[in-house]
Amino acid sequence: MRVIKLGGSLESAKTLLHCLNRIEQQYRNQKVVIVTGGGVFAEQVRIAQQHWQFNDECAHAMALLAMQQMARLVKGLKVDVELAHSVRAIQQSQSHIIVWSPDIDELNNAGIPATWDITSDSLAAWLANVLSADELLVIKSAVIDDTLSLAQLAERGIIDKAFCECVANSVFTVRVINQQCL
């Protein structure tokens, strides 16, 4: 099984549909779980938090709702994908392409901290670990220098601050690529 994290900025870069088409073509005979970033919806959470000054716990829950909205968007664009709201639903699915719509309670029960240091990047790593995935492929709109380590990508803000810790003891392969390399 492969977990593919689609950066939220792919939506605003207008390449989301292209990436979904490429995933369908390239992984036709493999089980794939798509994790979406929150995109423009998550940006609105950041703006609202700055304006209203609510705590990170509230922002975290709202950012997860943003990921759910993006998952619904993917389902709207690709009606054949299955929308799964839990790890168990993913594990039981017979579908070939699944898009994860994260459940707030499931993540809270797993002890995922409510902080902007943990974004959909780290949540994709958490999911890949829980599912015992073979690979975590993180697709970004940013230009990726493939000579940089994960720590260097985190320093540059390409992946979130907690990502390296989330994949530190993982047995799956981790790749971070630009959308053009898909």
Where would I find each of the regions flagged by the language model?
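Nucleotide/pyrophosphate-binding catalytic subdomain
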Residues: M1-C181
